């Protein structure tokens, strides 16, 4: 990058693979600081880790501190130099559950700053294609969970548990806040230990230090669940049962969090 500001594409062309691991805090701003370091050193790190993914390695580990001002300048350079489409794609793909997402994004950004805004359109390029694969996975999960989230009543609040591969709570937020504008509810992502909480019409995304255990559903809720399961089983015409079709529309990994499927999980 040039000074503390933007990325210089001429310097990006002198890129080399480095036997070093970046370690950052897992936040988007922290990732942007990894991007800055990569450009400043003209290097592609061997790996980029968060504390949760840290493991034994023979390579030196470089701690990348999160600097808010630096991260803001890096992010501003995306829109200014690469365009809104690239800014959107990088921001969205950071929510991917792929363990190598940071490395894929850094490789793409080096290419994009070298070639310009049109890089994002080169979907067949080996450093561009993975970004669309991550986006496809995110879009697919968001679409599925908009229909498959099952709420239970817990002490006057609606609660649901999900196990997504990607961190999709920020992407689910507009849908469920629009669907339940007057309700108090929470959606707990048990994989990423995060909660989407709406209370008194205020919505927050919270990262938890420990797993969350929801209280048992109320007796009234259990009665409704029993009725729903009975309705679900009665609705099906057994002679037309299509297990392949059912698995296609509702993959088995969703079943554990769906009331009507728990008996079959």
Give names to the regions the model predicted.
Residues 30-41, 107-114, 174-178, 226-233:
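Short, hydrophobic/amphipathic alpha-helical patches that form generic packing surfaces
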Residues 20-27, 62, 126, 157-168, ...:
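Conserved aromatic-histidine-acidic binding/catalytic patches
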Residues 89-93, 190-191, 240-247:
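Short coil/turn segments at secondary-structure boundaries
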Residues 49-144:
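Charged, alpha-helical interface segments at or near domain boundaries
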Residues 117-208:
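Internal, well-folded beta-alpha domain core
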Residues 65-74, 202-214:
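Acidic, Ser/Thr-rich peripheral helices and adjacent loops at domain boundaries
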Residues 2-67:
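N-terminal ordered "arm"
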Residues 182-184, 195-202, 212-265:
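Long, compositionally biased intrinsically disordered terminal regions
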